[in-house]
Amino acid sequence: MSPVPTPPSPPAPRLTPATAVALAADLAALPFTTAAVEGLLGPVATLALDRAHAEAARRVVAGHLAGPGRHDDAAGPGDRHGTRGLAAAVGAWLLGDPVPAADLDAALPSLGLAGAVAAGLVVEGPDGRVRGAVDLSPYEADEPGRMWIASDLTAQQRRGPLPPEHVLGVGRASLTLAGATQRRPVARALDVGVGCGIQTLHLLAHADHVTATDLSERALAFTRFNLLLNADVLGLDRDRLEDRVRLAAGDLLAPVTGERFDLVVSNPPFVITPRTDPDAPVLTYRDGGREGDRIVAELIAALPDVLAEGGTAQLLANWEIPAGDTADADTAPWDARPRSWVAPGMQAWLLQRDRQDPAGYAETWLQDSSLELDPPAYEAAYRGYLDDFAARGVAGVGFGHVWLRRPAADGSQGRA
């Protein structure tokens, strides 16, 4: 039995300054916020959705969209029909379900359904219904504030495994990095592996200028979309994004050779993936295409080249833990390998938050991509992980934070 082919993603969404203004106004008016969505779904469905189980939320949304539509101002906020627009947005963009086109059109009076289709936010289907083409989620933080983040549909929304070109939304890893990053004002910041742009959005609250790099043109397109959509809260001029943000395509630090930054952040594609099949696709959203933990080693070793004096780098990483001479894998030293990547003269702090054995690591990342939905592919990939780790004598894999600082010439503690 051969693996089931994974359907490709639709084109990345796109906005003009004018359509970004229209969409932002519509989402704010719904209001498409975390609190409003939780109020619509209720605590049970909200918690279930947080656990990646959508059926309770689908039941609630279906109840709001049942029956004849009503899209006039007479429907108050407490009326069931007054929530149809919000329910349509939740159904399309948080659940990935088909919703009545008329309801979503009414929810977007400025952009309109035609504008949403043209922007790549929804695709039209049969029977007067539309389905979300992206995940568009409300996001709130103390800084910069209330926003909306677009990314590719999740495996739950797709109801199938993720394609290689997938662009992740805001997940636990990105929230971990955002929460750990020091927020002192800096002149120039760099986001390596920008993805949907969440770290860049945070950096703009305290950096004069941000450069964001990614190997994926699709990721850069999502980042541009999110910058345009949230320009008001970010303090950006939609017609002059380049005044404060530069989006650069390329591998790791290649697009910024010769430049210096006060702060570098990165949630790189650090996930270790067997490279036993040269024809296997590279999952650019999480796997840098190198063997083992080589992509993290390359990044850590090269970061001094882009750090200004007193500058700091903060990143998340995986590192392999060799079996060594001990029979107990849990006692093998975890930091010898990542410390060997740090250039002389750099100050380094390493924090290991988690450690997994080879089987546990394989299960975590195969489930993350929902490959269990394709049992033959899952079993083959699981065996590939075990063979790959065994071939290199890997006892475990560590996950954690790496903080680097280039000392200032005057011995001060740095800019960030």
Residue ranges and their predicted role:
Residues 162-171, 183, 215-383, 388, ...:
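S-adenosylmethionine
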Residues 100-167:
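Non-catalytic substrate-recognition/targeting regions of SAM-dependent transferases
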Residues 21, 26-130:
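Accessory substrate-recognition/RNA-binding modules or partner subunits associated with SAM-dependent
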Residues 386-416:
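C-terminal lobe and adjacent flexible extensions of AdoMet/dcAdoMet transferase-like proteins
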Residues 209-214:
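Conserved SAM-binding motif I beta-strand of class I
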